[in-house]
From Swiss-Prot:
One of its GO terms (molecular function) is rRNA binding. This is Small ribosomal subunit protein uS14. It comes from Amoebophilus asiaticus (strain 5a2). Binds 16S rRNA, required for the assembly of 30S particles and may also be responsible for determining the conformation of the 16S rRNA at the A site. Part of the 30S ribosomal subunit. Contacts proteins S3 and S10.
Length: 89
């Protein structure tokens, strides 16, 4: 489990990215890199890390489900993810 402060920091970054997305796009299109540099650092989408919604784990993140591989495996075994079954052949 990631620390709550790390999860909160990432959520704060996501909110900043959403708030400045239109402004960033407009400045990029105009080529105004000086004004772009004045925006907050955390408003850049590259600073947001994909994290598991349950544990906050950053590695082994499955984008399609929004959870880590460990949580995915547990939930799939318990049948909590619709349409996901263990493979057998």
């Amino acid at each position: 489990m990631a620390k709550e402060s790390v999860k909160a920091r990432n959520l704060k970054r996501q909110a900043l990215v959403e708030r400045y997305a239109a402004k960033r796009a407009k400045l990029k299109e105009a080529g105004d890199y000086l004004a772009l540099d004045k925006l907050p650092k955390n408003a850049s989408p590259v600073r947001v890390r994909n994290r598991c919604k349950i544990t906050g784990r950053a590695r082994g993140y499955m984008r399609k489900f929004g959870i880590s591989r460990i949580v995915f495996r547990e939930w799939a075994a318990q049948g909590k993810i619709p349409g996901v079954i263990k493979a057998s052949w």
